[in-house]
From Swiss-Prot:
It is found in: Cytoplasm. The gene is proS. Consists of three domains: the N-terminal catalytic domain, the editing domain and the C-terminal anticodon-binding domain. This is Proline--tRNA ligase. It comes from Caldanaerobacter subterraneus subsp. tengcongensis (strain DSM 15242 / JCM 11007 / NBRC 100824 / MB4). Keywords: Aminoacyl-tRNA synthetase, ATP-binding, Cytoplasm, Ligase, Nucleotide-binding, Protein biosynthesis. Its EC number is 6.1.1.15. Catalyzes the attachment of proline to tRNA(Pro) in a two-step reaction: proline is first activated by ATP to form Pro-AMP and then transferred to the acceptor end of tRNA(Pro). As ProRS can inadvertently accommodate and process non-cognate amino acids such as alanine and cysteine, to avoid such errors it has two additional distinct editing activities against alanine. One activity is designated as 'pretransfer' editing and involves the tRNA(Pro)-independent hydrolysis of activated Ala-AMP. GO terms for cellular component: cytosol. Its main location: cytoplasm.
Length: 573
């Protein structure tokens, strides 16, 4: 492809609304342009990268026996109403009516559609197991689209669903998809962690996310270098240490206008780990008091799961409700003597603490030497805390590390949630009708592209891994007015094409600096430069990922470039 003909509108200035490297570079390198908030159009280079990632996904899915289909993006409401998810998705779901006033949505996910297909087409155990997948556009009306394609309202996703006769079969399908995902992300040149995760609105169990470590990631991950344990913040646990202390008598302490943990630490000169804080919530019309150690935060996703409610059904209580429940102003809530019907949710660490300090449910007072079991008991004891750096790994006891990550893939076992709701059954060998056991497996194609850029860039631009680069090689004649440079460049370009390599030639009549800057910005892995030394029969080869330049004889350059490309592709295979 000739750059003089390629639609590649590079930018010199950073777009004002671009906050992270991948967003900046996808715009600057001319991969995409913004159409509206959270909606982008892909230009030729961007489309080629998407296609490369999609082909890697297809190859690895097909390798595990999956079959590709294509479902409708427009979904009738009846399917989501059958599973009860028409309302669960809330405002994120794009809903619309046709001319006959029938409800539809633009698909945010496709569990219902795949299950509907299978319930109509699969009847016998002989048709199982089955894994179907598609690569298709999804739609979610994000409240605040940001970070380019990281959180957009329209995105390309590979979603797959496995259908098995039993849980043992699901385990096998799950492991197939796990292997496929590892190969996909390895081939894309990504460094990633596989973490335990919360399945969210999709339901299910044994949920794992493929996380690309990045400082701009929206997810928080806890991981252990010693044993390999990794989990996102909604699932991360830590080892709880019991404290072997003699229980002391409780004592009320006057703490005038001392409301926060920080103020209490300063006032009482005691470590924050000796406090237990009580947060009052409204949860689906009921009052919940949640307790965690004073130096920790409540993880509200964990709390939602414990209470079996949706995100929009949980909110912190206002001052009036806090006073009604505690009889005190905000800042003095505790577990002893709460008024009315209050569900007490106690973090699993609290029973192991001794002689801790809580609010007295009386303005300007706290209580010392409180102990779980002796002085109060919870209605629910569960892990509702966020882990922090240095907490001990629940598996091996080594210190945990905390990092941010970009979720690029998610696999989980749905079980029979959707097959039972939609009546997707099969007849077993004895003639018994049983629900099909399902798994769900997703990869964000756009996100994967952005994650690759986050891990592979420098101050000059993108550094594409060979497997996903829009082109393998760019041929750059420094001066197209020099007939010898031009002819040699054209000859090399055509011979590389004959070798089935993907090649750009920068045949534009612009300064050499512009050509080199654009080549670095768009990140083509190999640059062949034809300059003044061509008179001596020498051209230069430079890899985007390195600073060194290799001088090669003109007659050897095609062989050498082909060798480099093949080596780089092998490294990622």
């Amino acid at each position: 492809m000739r750059l003089s003909q390629l639609l590649m509108p590079t930018l010199r200035e950073v777009p004002a609304d671009a906050e992270i490297p991948s967003h900046v570079l996808m715009l600057k390198a001319g991969l995409m342009r913004k159409l509206a908030a959270g909606i982008y159009v892909y230009l030729p280079l961007g489309k080629r990268v998407l296609k490369k990632v999609e082909e890697i996904v297809r190859e690895e899915m097909d390798r595990e026996g999956s079959q590709e289909v294509l479902m409708s993006a427009l979904i009738p409401a009846e399917l989501f109403k059958e599973t009860g998810r028409w309302d669960v998705f809330g405002p994120e779901m794009f809903k619309l009516k046709d001319r006959n006033e029938r409800d539809f949505c633009l698909g945010p996910t496709h569990e219902e559609v795949f299950t509907d297909l299978v319930r109509n087409e699969v009847k016998s155990y002989r048709q199982l197991p089955l894994i179907l997948y598609q690569i298709q556009t999804k739609f979610r009306d994000e409240r605040r689209p940001r970070f380019g394609v990281m959180r957009s309202r329209e995105f390309i996703m590979k979603d797959a669903y496995s259908f098995d006769a039993d849980w043992e079969g699901l385990d096998e399908s799950f492991n197939k998809m796990y292997r496929a995902y590892c190969r996909i992300f390895d081939r894309c040149g990504l460094k990633y962690l596989v973490v335990e995760a919360d399945p969210g609105a999709m339901g299910g169990r044994d949920s794992k996310e493929f996380m690309v470590i990045s400082s701009v990631g929206e997810a928080v991950i806890a991981y252990c270098d010693s044993c390999g344990y990794a989990a996102n913040e909604e699932k991360a646990e830590c080892l709880i240490e019991s404290r072997d202390e003699e229980m002391l008598e409780i004592e009320k302490v006057y703490t005038p206008n001392v409301k926060t943990i920080e103020e209490l630490v300063d006032f009482l000169k005691i470590s924050p780990s000796k406090f237990v804080k009580t947060l009052i919530y409204k949860a689906k019309g009921k009052v919940v008091a949640a307790l965690v150690r004073g130096d920790r935060d409540i993880n509200e996703t964990k709390l939602l799961n414990v209470l079996s409610i949706r995100e929009e059904e949980l909110e912190l209580a206002d001052g009036a409700l806090v006073e009604e429940v505690t009889g005190a102003k905000v800042g003095f809530a505790g577990p002893l003597g709460l008024k009315g019907e209050v569900t007490l949710v106690v973090d699993s660490e609290i029973p192991q603490l001794r002689n801790f300090i809580v609010g007295a449910n009386e303005t300007d007072y706290h209580i010392k030497n409180v102990n779980y079991g002796r002085d109060f008991k919870g209605d629910i004891v569960a892990d509702i805390k966020s882990v922090v750096e240095g907490d001990r790994c629940p598996r091996c006891g080594a210190p945990l590390k905390i990092a941010r990550g970009i979720e690029v893939g998610h696999i989980f076992k749905l079980g029979t949630k959707y097959s039972e709701a939609l009546g997707a059954t099969y007849t077993d060998e004895e003639g018994n009708e049983k629900p099909i056991v399902m798994g769900c497996y997703g990869i964000g194609i756009n996100r994967t592209v952005a994650a690759i850029i986050e891990q592979h860039h420098d101050e000059k631009g993108i550094i594409w891994p060979m497997s996903v680069a829009p082109y393998h090689v760019i041929v750059v004649p420094v001066n197209v007015s020099d007939e010898e440079q031009k002819q040699i460049a054209e000859k090399i370009y055509n011979k590389l094409l004959e070798e089935k390599l993907e090649v750009l030639i920068d045949d534009r009549d612009v300064r050499a600096g512009v050509k080199f800057n654009d080549a670095d910005l768009i990140g083509i892995p190999v640059r062949v430069t034809i300059g003044k030394k061509v008179k001596e029969g020498i051209v230069e080869i430079k890899l985007r990922e390195r600073e060194e330049v290799e001088e090669v004889k003109v007659e050897e350059v095609v062989k050498r470039v082909k060798q480099i490309v093949e080596e780089k592709l092998r490294e990622l295979s």
